[in-house]
Amino acid sequence: MRMFKPLFLALSLAIVIPTHATAVEIPATFQVQGAGYGHGVGMSQIGARAKALAGETATAILSYYYKDVVIEPLDDTKILRVNVGHLLTSAKMASGTQDATMQIYSGDIGDAQDVVPIAVVPIKSSLNFTIMGSTVLPSVVTGKKSVSIPRNRVFTVRWSGTRYLSGVDGVVSLTHNNTTKKYRYGQLQFRAVKTATLGYRLEITNSVRLSDEYLWGVSEVPSSWPEAALQAQAIASRTFAMSKAGIYRASCDCDLYGEISDQSFLGYAKETEKGWGHLWKAAVTNTVGLTLTQSGKPIAAYFSSSSGGLTETAGNAWGTQRGYTQSVPDLSSLDPVLNPRFYRWDRTITQASVSAAFVLPDVVNLEIVMKNASGTVATIKATSSAGIQKSLRGETFRSRTKIPSAYFDLVGMQNAVEPTPSPSP
């Protein structure tokens, strides 16, 4: 079996839609075959695990994936605003701890202690938040009874057992979009933010201390992984967060998102995961303050799940070169045992998705114009039924069409190769 070949994008011509003006056939779907998951820049998490299994240390792992960096302790106790709810119209918050208290304040009160709550939420009650015009409307719900609180642009909620409010250690739940997560630390802010096309939407942030309250809840790799891999991830995650801290983004009311667009923040469930959570917490604690730096400043320590056999540089992926990113061999990403889901993958993309990616009415042909040395697509060109041509960076195409990676080839088209047959069982 071939261990590495930047893999494939196959066009399905089984169903076609004739155009009104010409005989050009418009494919209904595009079948995709490739390798790796994510942008491939920086540390490969699958590669880090493989190196840890082989006995390498966290320092050795990080030094392999990041060029000319220093690993040194920095003060990482700053407070982060982590977005935990984006572009919402409503959300629900409740306390799941007996005798814990929950209080709501009008405004964004920061770290202030000399503030008076506008309401104390009774036990077995919840706080519901709804966008109302350009404001947020909170209501306290107890059983079937709902009491509204005067609207405001932003509210802060605190609960007992945190840095902000003494008392019984509380754990709160936050529910939106049919998903519930639990939070133990910091405080939550609920703000109405104006968007370009949707009007006002609800943005929810969790203000947490980076060094522990935040990092304990980061969920980027399984906590069951080897210690060195967990420590390498803890240092990379700390470094990435340090590079974002204090750079406020109005669109999310945050320093960074709690999703994979920055890095995944699961909250309290990560450190309390049965059987494994304490291992991740230990990895964070045992690497306290350790940060990847150049010239004394934290780097943007990019990482992704896996590559197509070679990692990618930031310049190739996004157009802005970062000297500490480099393309290095990452053959573990192509190991079906270590990377069973993404050593090779197959997807089907709709015509609508591809044409939307290129902002064209339709796409009848795709052509890879150039490839990077890593095997990722540098430029991919689309042609519409009217003959209009547009090009995209390969990483942009990946992001817009939601395929796993930019390591692919075209099949059955202008500069195509034959598809790789599926491995025998």
Task: Name these PLM-found stretches.
Residues 2-425:
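Conserved, single-site charged/polar hotspot
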